Amino acid sequence: MENRGRNPSFLSLLLLLSLFAIASAKVFFEERFEDGWEKRWVKSEWKKDESMAGEWNYTSGKWNGDANDKGIQTSEDYRFYAISAEFPEFSNKDNTLVFQFSVKHEQKLDCGGGYMKLLSGEVDQKKFGGDTPYSIMFGPDICGYSTKKVHAIFNYNDTNHLIKKDVPCETDQLTHVYTFILRPDATYSILIDNQEKQTGSLYTDWDLLPAKKIKDPEAKKPEDWDDKEFIPDPEDKKPEGYDDIPAEITDPEAKKPEDWDDEEDGEWTAPTIPNPEYKGPWKAKKIKNPNYKGKWKAPMIDNPEFKDDPELYVYPKLRYVGVELWQVKSGTLFDNVLVCDDPEYAKQLAEETWGKQKDAEKAAFEELEKKREEEETKDDPVESDAEDEDEAEADDSDKDDADKSDDKDDDQHDEL
């Protein structure tokens, strides 16, 4: 029998090549929040004067897949949060940029951010806040029913530009990994839990540059342009007597009341009702216009204001990563922050952390939810009484069934 399997040496070569590619990845910043993390991160004093600065907890959360894998979590409601870390300055020119992190909303978030930022140049980390310029902002944002999306915002020429596509974010209480990939050809991908959710181009999905083509402002619709798709049928004629049909007629079912007195009530007149034969003003039926040319559109021309930027994707002085957000309800946990140039390395990191822990985390969450529901049932006397009544009704029903069964057995016994 012919062996159609892969040559073991070939598979080994593929594995080695894959490992080599990952090993050659440039990692500009990687934070798993292990020992010493506080030396790498600077807590901002932004909003402290107003007593509105929130504190961070170092924790693995109330439920997790590994109690030893910790991150930083917002801990106070109705607070602003700002924290950042510095890494050696680099440019993503001619290279792929990968920005990835995990986030978990333990608080059943109803309004608050879960995004992170990449910043360039010189930043006073102690003053890092909402007004600090940034290069890229990326991650989930939730507020009410209307906002449940992934932000992907680019700063270009000192203006922040939001992505024009809608990318829904995860809204449960489990950990999810968000990945943004920006390539030298100005294309991008957004991944959630290693699954691509959106992809496209900086040229089309953001308004970073003026449009390449615009409608010709000098163009005018030709006078003989027929844009009526349907026209009245010239062969259709109005039926004879059509205009003589009244809109209302006397109700043939109406009868003069027996107690009607003409001398006192006046002459009785039957009420009128809509005439079922009346069809309204006559209109000729519509037919397709044989001269229809379609809806007129101005021709597109080159936009004189468009100037291409081959370095549209480039951020030459990336140097910081930070979290800056407002939360109505706290409990968001950030972990496993990565800035690198290799999507495969990012994928591997996600699998080594989130991938290995997700099932255990989900099981732990479901167990806690089960206990919480049981406790709420115990603490709710109305619900407990209702359950007792249901049980009592069930017992009475069982008793009635048993009595009926006994009576039936007695009847059968008498017949015997």
UniProtKB/Swiss-Prot annotation:
The keyword Cell membrane does not apply. PROSITE patterns: CALRETICULIN_1, CALRETICULIN_2, CALRETICULIN_REPEAT, ER_TARGET. It comes from Beta vulgaris. Residues 197-262 are annotated as: 4 X approximate repeats. A motif (Prevents secretion from ER) lies at residues 413-416. InterPro entries: Calret/calnex, Calret/calnex_CS, Calreticulin, Calreticulin/calnexin_P_dom_sf, ConA-like_dom_sf. Residues 217-281, 351-416 are annotated as: Disordered. Keywords: Calcium, Chaperone, Disulfide bond, Endoplasmic reticulum, Glycoprotein, Lectin, Metal-binding, Repeat, Signal, Zinc. An alpha-D-glucoside binds at residues 115, 117, 134, 141, 324. Residues 1-25 form the signal peptide. Residues 266-304 are annotated as: 3 X approximate repeats. This is Calreticulin. It is found in: Endoplasmic reticulum lumen. Sequence repeats lie at residues 197-208, 216-227, 233-244, 251-262, 266-276, 280-290, 294-304. Molecular calcium-binding chaperone promoting folding, oligomeric assembly and quality control in the ER via the calreticulin/calnexin cycle. This lectin may interact transiently with almost all of the monoglucosylated glycoproteins that are synthesized in the ER. It comes from the Eukaryota. Glycans are attached at residues 57, 157. Pfam families: Calreticulin. Belongs to the calreticulin family. Disulfide bonds join 111-143. GO terms for biological process: ERAD pathway; protein folding. GO terms for cellular component: endoplasmic reticulum lumen; endoplasmic reticulum membrane. Residues 382-400 have a biased composition (Acidic residues). The lineage of its organism: Eukaryota, Viridiplantae, Streptophyta, Embryophyta, Tracheophyta. Can be divided into a N-terminal globular domain, a proline-rich P-domain forming an elongated arm-like structure and a C-terminal acidic domain. The P-domain binds one molecule of calcium with high affinity, whereas the acidic C-domain binds multiple calcium ions with low affinity. GO terms for molecular function: calcium ion binding; carbohydrate binding; unfolded protein binding. Its main location: endoplasmic reticulum. Residues 217-241, 351-381, 401-416 have a biased composition (Basic and acidic residues).
